[in-house]
Amino acid sequence: MSQEDWMWQMQNRITDLATLKNHITLSAEEESVFQAAQEQFSFSITPYYLSLLDPTNPTCPIRKQVLPRSSELVRAENEWEDPLAEQIHMPIKGVTHRYPDRAIWYISHICAVYCRFCTRKRKVSKPTETPNREEWREALEYFRNHTEIKEVILSGGDPLTLSDQHIDYLLGELSAIDHINHLRIHTRYPVTMPMRITDSLCGIFSKYFPLYIVTHFNHPKELTQEVKVAVTKLIQKGNVTLLNQSVLLKDVNDTVEILEELNYKLVRFGIKPYYLHQCDEVYGSSGFVVPIEDGIRLMYDIRGRMSGLTVPNYVKDLTGGGGKVLLGPNYLIEKKESSYLFKNFNGGEYEVTH
């Protein structure tokens, strides 16, 4: 088994401080908070993704996404364990049915790399949170019985952690449900472990058109030659449509220049920029949050200089389970002391804390 094998990458993930220090030079802050942060949320990084990280520079944008910082140990008043209220809208273990016509199916608790701003920090890396095979059957029965569901989104953790056989089974069962219009997979493995995209996996994907895969690239440094090979394989052999959702992250991608490079490069690789998310208000995320007015200003500048194909929608998933809302200069009504007041498409108003 070689480094080009995804199972080798999984088996050789760096998960502890001592091993990490053999590969990179840690700042005093990074080392001091590592253990305390790991008590709340696991650390893991693949050798591949580690190779993208600057081993000596604490301001490296890859490094900032994966190494704990002191701000992660601070819990602000507006931060929640489950900011999107997924547990409240969970009729069956692993299934979040928050929107009428679509449901998220959480089928893996494992990620190759654990992002420090993860919305699901409360459950990712915890085996007890993953549905077992009997609970898979219960979820499939739920999807069959709820004819209003037009889309099922496989998520996690990372759903591509599952074996090819299990992925084939789940996609086959879901595709056989008449009222399901299409399927979507959310995965960060094309970013953190592109060797997961094998010929055999793409052969499975090709059987289930239309299949949409949403990747999670946040910085142009992540778009490597290895990624280009994997993405080309997904499109040409897997017959999938590729979209990308980024998170707007302070000191990672919060400039016009970085977002321009990221989104043009995504389109060149064959991936449509889909969403730019305002960082969710999950506990420990304050160090990543870009003020919404700065995000709006960025989008205003981007729309004036970039092709429409390269421009994502800037959105906020409302804390408390209110769903996604579009953020933009045309919809901001008022900035208050601790929140923004927006108007949405149907004339209703909503408030977003900052």
Please give the residue ranges for each predicted region.
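Short, flexible loop/turn elements at secondary-structure junctions
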Residues: 109-111, 158, 189, 219, ...
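Conserved AdoMet/S-adenosylmethionine-binding subsite of the radical SAM
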Residues: 137-147, 151, 160-306
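Canonical Radical SAM [4Fe-4S] cluster-binding loop centered on the CxxxCxxC motif
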Residues: 97-134, 185
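C-terminal accessory regions of radical SAM enzymes
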Residues: 44, 297-354
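Flexible, acidic/Gly-rich N-terminal and inter-domain linker regions that tether
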Residues: 1-97
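Conserved, mostly hydrophobic/aromatic
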Residues: 49, 115, 274
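Short, charged beta->alpha transition segments
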Residues: 90-93, 103-106, 137-142
